[in-house]
A protein has these predicted regions:
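Structural motif
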Residues: 9-11, 23, 91
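Conserved non-cysteine loop/helix-boundary elements of the Radical SAM core domain that shape
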Residues: 30-55, 59-163
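Local cysteine-cluster metal-coordination motifs and their immediate loop/turn environment
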Residues: 15-30
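N-terminal [4Fe-4S]-dependent radical SAM core
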Residues: 1-12, 55-58
């Protein structure tokens, strides 16, 4: 890693490529059959983050996307960011699938500074969800929003697809 110290704040995107099912519209690098690699992948991400941390003064935003980040163990995911120089006002986002939102995971996220959830809703219309290859239903979305709000997260993004 270069010895250049980055003086300005900047953002980090972490791609978590694991999914329970590949959505029909998805063109991202994702895996549905490699759960055995989750722990090694997250450990490699943690090692890379530690190596880069020596050049980072302040991280202004973190976005964990995928894939389905909330499909992997929340504590292992959050361990990647322990000790990194997050700015006190950093926006820290985890992308979530409505089928996998749990109070326990949200508690871990909040304890590690997550203050924004991006919920992969795509649609609230059952036949549209089916045509997209999505497994969740509108009730899962309502339940997920309630869990997210109860965890104290006020900044919530709902991803929607139109067209």
């Amino acid at each position: 890693m270069s010895q250049v110290v980055l003086r300005n704040r900047f953002g980090i995107y972490l791609h978590v490529p694991f999914c329970s099912k590949k959505c029909d519209y998805c063109s991202f690098a994702t895996w549905t059959d490699r759960d055995h690699l989750v722990e090694d992948y997250l450990q490699a991400c943690k090692a890379q983050a530690r190596e880069a941390a020596s050049s980072i003064r302040s991280i202004s935003s973190v976005f964990i996307g995928g894939g389905t980040p909330n499909l992997v163990p929340a504590q292992l995911l959050m361990d990647i960011f322990d000790g990194l120089p997050l700015h006190p006002d950093a926006e820290f986002t985890v992308e979530c699938n409505p089928d996998h939102v749990t109070p326990d995971d949200l508690e871990i996220y909040v304890d590690h500074g997550v203050n924004r959830i991006s919920l992969g809703v795509q649609s609230m219309v059952p036949h549209v969800l089916a045509s997209l290859g999505r497994e969740h239903n509108p009730d899962n979305v309502h339940n997920s929003v309630e869990i997210i709000r109860n965890a104290g997260i006020k900044n919530l993004n709902l991803d929607l697809i139109y067209g």
